[in-house]
Amino acid sequence: MQISVESVNSIKKKLNFEIPADKVSAEVDKAYAEIRKHAAIKGFRKGKVPMSLIEKHYGEKMAEDVVKNLVQESYFSAVSEQGLNPVGYPAIESDQLKKGEPFKYSATVEVFPEVEVKDYTGLEVVKEKLEVDDSVVAARLKEMQERMAQLGPAPEGHAAAMGDFVTFDFKGSIDGVYFEGGSAEDFQLELGSGRFIPGFEEQMVGMTVGTNSTIKVNFPEGYGNADLSGKPADFEVSVKEIKVKELPELNDDFAKEFGEEFETLDLLKAKLAEINETQEASRINAELRDRLIKALIEKNEIEVPEALVDRQVQMMLESTKQRLASQRLSLDMMGMTDDSYKAQFREAAREQVKGSLLLDAVAEKEKIEPTEEELEAQLSVIAEQTRQDLEKVAQLYKTNERAKDNLMAQMREDKAVKFILDRAKVTEVPKAEIK
């Protein structure tokens, strides 16, 4: 068998094969013999069908089987012999198979790039300075008050405001004709919740119990009901009741509602400040990591296989779908399809692939590997985060080789990031100065 390898570019190879005629003939005879065992042709017993009829009825299938066998056997053998590291499946181009003649075909495949990483020490990056913002704690306390609020009847003559709960009847019409699904009685709506068509809730502000009014709105383009999409509508509304939120007082008793450890309001505030600081530090470090990897890529521009980009953007898509599902949302509700998502985030996926390949190269060059002690520590973190028993988590990764390999790869990448960061020139600046 003759094999030659062409470099289409740094990440794509073309393997050319010529398989000897005697090998082709042997495979053809073998395929015919196998088909003959099971061939069912009227007038002949199985295994006794003449070869000429086998060729006539099964020639196309035979050719497919032979080509498949020849390609599989020769391609994987050649990839191993040539020391190639393919990404995905090859694109095959072949001549027509003819018994007694050599069979020629080519296999074009993307391969992992050979990355010679450089200039990864002394990278200059900026880091956002951690600044405590007391307003964040105040806003969080306000949210907690809102969650514990009780609804009470509004004072007589009270004008509806954002945040109030209004009970009303409504009937919607277009060009004077009432439409299906456009009316309800005793409907309760929190003004400002965004549950209604844009502009509806704002026009209810200022109404009082007993108000009868007409609200004019436009259904947005792309509205779920195509018959209403983009059309102006009138809603006759009759306000029947208004309830206002009665917020609990911010004091020690309020704090105790959130746990025995919060005996005073100051203790609750301190905990909220601690949580906020931890979250901010995590965000700042994640953004620093992104800037560091971006700086590394700028020093080491590399080509990446499209198959790896495809794989990465698919993983991003699935992760996004899971996150949205946890919030009872969907991609469709965000106005996107799988294809539009992939198109929008493809370049981001490409940069992630570049970063991973470069970090892997740094780890390889610096002989960076996670230790068993580090693995055990990470398993403890996972157990705590998922609220599972440590032994159960450890057993899962012990029996699931793929999961363990993925975890070790992520830990290796994290250690490579730390290695580069420890040797980088990091400048802390206020958030306002970061571009």
From Swiss-Prot:
Q: What reaction does this enzyme carry out catalytically? A: [protein]-peptidylproline (omega=180) = [protein]-peptidylproline (omega=0)
Cellular compartment(s): Cytoplasm
Q: Where is the PPIase FKBP-type domain?
A: 163-248
GO biological processes: 'de novo' cotranslational protein folding; cell division; chaperone-mediated protein folding; protein transport; protein unfolding
Lyase as a keyword of this entry, yes or no, is: no
Q: What class of enzyme is it?
A: isomerase
User: Gene Ontology terms, cellular component aspect?
Assistant: cytoplasm
Could you tell me the EC number(s) of this protein?
5.2.1.8
Name the keywords, alphabetized.
Answer: Cell cycle, Cell division, Chaperone, Cytoplasm, Isomerase, Rotamase
**Record keyword Cell cycle present:** yes
Name a GO molecular-function annotation.
Answer: peptidyl-prolyl cis-trans isomerase activity
What the entry lists under PANTHER family is as follows: TRIGGER FACTOR CHAPERONE AND PEPTIDYL-PROLYL CIS/TRANS ISOMERASE (PTHR30560), TRIGGER FACTOR-LIKE PROTEIN TIG, CHLOROPLASTIC (PTHR30560:SF3)
What family is it from?
A: Belongs to the FKBP-type PPIase family. Tig subfamily.
**Annotated domain remarks:** Consists of 3 domains; the N-terminus binds the ribosome, the middle domain has PPIase activity, while the C-terminus has intrinsic chaperone activity on its own.
Q: What does this protein do?
A: Involved in protein export. Acts as a chaperone by maintaining the newly synthesized protein in an open conformation. Functions as a peptidyl-prolyl cis-trans isomerase.
Q: Per its record, how is this protein called by name?
A: Trigger factor
Q: Which organism is it from?
A: Geobacter sp. (strain M21)
